[in-house]
Every structure is written in C-alpha cells, then in structure tokens.
C-alpha cells in the first residue's frame, strides 16, 4: 500500500506538510507580519523621534546634514524603519547578513562607532563642515522627510 503526502505552500513559498503529518505531532507555525491600521502612526512617531535625535546629534557633534536634503530624509526614514522592526536604529546604508546580530553587537547602531570615534558617517547623515557635500543645516522638518520619502 502506498501513501501519498500532499504538500501546501507555506511561508516564503516553501512546501510544508499538512498539520496532521507534521513531525513529532507539533504544528508548524509561520509568523506573518502585517501592517495594522495604526502602523503609519507608529512609523510617523519613529520618524519624528529619529528626526529629533538627528538634529540634536548634529548640533552636539558640530556636523551638518547633506546639502541634498533627500539624502538626509531617506537615511532618517531608514533609521526609523529599523527602529520599528529591529528595536534599534541600525545604519540603513549597509548590508547585513544578520541584522538582529548586528543590533545586538551595537557597532552599526546610530550613531555608529566610526561616527562617534572619527566623525565618519557612511550614510552622509552627519557631515563635517569641510565635507564637500555638507549643507548649512542641522534641522529638517517632518514634512520634508515625508515629502522626500513618499516616492519610495
């Protein structure tokens, strides 16, 4: 007698066996992250927190935002997104094999170690006055960030 086990598509398009045939009798679970109705408000709050942090840190470190405010806006939005999803403002301008491990290590959490030690910001968020791309501003409005990032 032959038995056939049918599969269904699970998380990430991977096949999974039906619950009745799962190994060791435990059902397989898949966490699906969905945006709730209040997700935009939550993200707006994080963007505002990161905006205020960026302005304060720029003043404290005597650095300036990029002359192209779109760069500043995108980086602040990326920091806010990482703060929401990872619990820390991990530098959004780098590739990580394991973001959770990077957050735990803290090296690339904003302000990152190179910024704190040598005033070197890979993201071009905090630029020294002698940098060719440095603007004259240490402030950016929430509206500027929303407008610049609404296209993405």
From Swiss-Prot:
Active site: 93 (nucleophile)
EC assignment: 1.8.7.2
Cofactor(s) listed in the protein's UniProt record: [4Fe-4S] cluster
Protein's UniProt name: Ferredoxin-thioredoxin reductase catalytic chain, chloroplastic
PANTHER family linked: FERREDOXIN-THIOREDOXIN REDUCTASE CATALYTIC CHAIN, CHLOROPLASTIC
Chief site of localization: plastid
Catalytic reaction equation(s): [thioredoxin]-disulfide + 2 reduced [2Fe-2S]-[ferredoxin] + 2 H(+) = [thioredoxin]-dithiol + 2 oxidized [2Fe-2S]-[ferredoxin]
Binding of [4Fe-4S] cluster, residues: 91, 110, 112, 121
Cofactor: how bound: Binds 1 [4Fe-4S] cluster.
Family stated for the protein in its record: Belongs to the ferredoxin thioredoxin reductase beta subunit family.
Gene from which the chain derives: FTRC
Span of chain positions assigned to the transit peptide in the UniProt entry: 1-38
Keywords associated with the record: 4Fe-4S, Chloroplast, Disulfide bond, Iron, Iron-sulfur, Metal-binding, Oxidoreductase, Plastid, Transit peptide
UniProt GO molecular function: 4 iron, 4 sulfur cluster binding; electron transfer activity; ferredoxin-thioredoxin reductase activity; metal ion binding; oxidoreductase activity, acting on iron-sulfur proteins as donors
Function: Catalytic subunit of the ferredoxin-thioredoxin reductase (FTR), which catalyzes the two-electron reduction of thioredoxins by the electrons provided by reduced ferredoxin.
InterPro entries per UniProt: FTR_bsu (IPR004209), FTR_bsu_sf (IPR036644)
Species per Swiss-Prot/TrEMBL record: Zea mays (Maize)
Cell compartment(s), UniProt: Plastid, Chloroplast
Subunit description: Heterodimer of subunit A (variable subunit) and subunit B (catalytic subunit). Heterodimeric FTR forms a complex with ferredoxin and thioredoxin.
Residues at the site labelled Increases the nucleophilicity of the active site Cys: 122
Gene Ontology CC terms, in alphabetical order: chloroplast
Disulfide bonds: 93-123
């Amino acid at each position: 007698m032959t038995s056939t086990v049918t599969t269904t598509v699970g998380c990430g398009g991977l096949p999974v066996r039906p619950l009745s045939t799962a190994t060791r009798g435990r059902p397989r679970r898949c966490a699906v992250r969905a945006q709730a109705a209040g997700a935009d408000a939550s993200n707006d709050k994080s963007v505002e927190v990161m905006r205020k942090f960026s302005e304060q840190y720029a003043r404290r470190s005597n650095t300036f935002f990029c002359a192209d405010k779109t760069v500043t806006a995108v980086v602040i939005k990326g920091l806010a997104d990482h703060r929401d999803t990872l619990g820390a403002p991990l530098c959004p301008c780098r590739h990580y094999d394991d973001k959770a491990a990077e957050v735990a290590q803290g090296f690339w959490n904003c302000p990152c170690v190179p910024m704190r030690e040598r005033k070197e910001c890979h993201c071009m968020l905090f630029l020294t006055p002698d940098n060719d791309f440095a603007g004259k501003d240490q402030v950016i409005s929430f509206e500027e960030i929303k407008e610049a990032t609404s296209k993405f």
